[in-house]
Swiss-Prot record:
Record bears the keyword Iron-sulfur: no
Every UmuC domain range: 7-183
Active site, UniProt feature: 107
Enzyme type, top EC level: transferase
One Pfam family from the record: IMS_C
Localization, UniProt: Cytoplasm
GO biological process: DNA-templated DNA replication; error-prone translesion synthesis; SOS response
Species name: Symbiobacterium thermophilum (strain DSM 24528 / JCM 14929 / IAM 14863 / T)
Residues at which Mg(2+) binds: 11, 106
Cofactors that this protein relies on: Mg(2+)
Protein name: DNA polymerase IV
A GO MF label: magnesium ion binding
Gene symbol of the encoding locus: dinB
Amino acid sequence: MRTDLWVIHLDMDAFFASIEQRDNPRLRGKPVIVGGSPNSRGVVSTCSYEARRFGVRSAMPSREALRLCPQAVFIRPNHAKYAAVGRQVRAIMRRFTDVIEPLSIDEAFLDVSGQDAVRVARELKEAIRAELHLTGSAGVSYCKFLAKLASDMQKPDGLTVITWERAQELLPTLPVRKLWGVGPASEQALHALGIYTCGDLLAYDPDTLRKHFGKRADELILLARGIDPRPVVPYREAKSIGEENTFPVDQTDREYLSRLLERYADNLAEELRRQGLYARTVTVKIKWNVFVEGGPKGGDFLQITRSQTLPMPTNDARTIGRVAREIFARVEWEGRKVRLLGLSVHNLVKQGEQVQAYLPI
């Protein structure tokens, strides 16, 4: 890991809703919900902090949001406008560094090594406020994981710094769900082992942890110690994202394989969010222990893929995992064993460039 790395994670505050409040003074101070209509099967895209005080959250059904906050003002998303503002934010970022890794339309990592990172974060926030009349929360640290963790500690309009010394104070009691890449399925698997905090994780036998999580165990251990070797990588567009595993012993345990798909879904959802992408198609790949002769390679193991297209693009781990399990449950085994299992997502779209028809209004 680089010892001279300094990273800023900038996360714009309630981005879509804040833009609407900025552009319409009558909405300022009111609970604003950007998303689908509560009169149909709409969902909340985002909401203002005034609405969040009533328990409204992103991805919540709009009807539930209306029940929690009857006085809320619902606004149809204008993704073209949000994307334009996102480009303005990115242009301001580029004044400070060219090494920018977008996570979504409203958040990004910036590599500001060799500069006064705290000063840069402060000036970046001030420029966005002065020119765009919006606020963002910044986290500053020596690695990406902790910079992202820091940006969420003083929202909205915060600036938090996590040094190595501060990390050693925070991490022992940090819930494992806060670790990079730990989604609902991984959190549940860790809890089943009695691991609830980073301190618990570091106290657990690493060899036993590897039996449950494979090479991912070592990544979790490093994160729990405050070590994240990943560099800030400028965005490169992907056509699909996937993960698969060839087993040393052919598998017949459907429940185990179903849980493995959930773990894959956690990882894919995290990667989608990292790249600011949503997926509309989920594909399960299975290679059986049945060898079929022929073809250019002289033969190969029998393989099938099964896909399902979603009504709306998603980067939610639970949704991807649920669809993957449903696909898997429909596969007929016919007495065969599983040699390889994979999960991938396709038909990727960038946040802010989604077709508005995807959102039920």
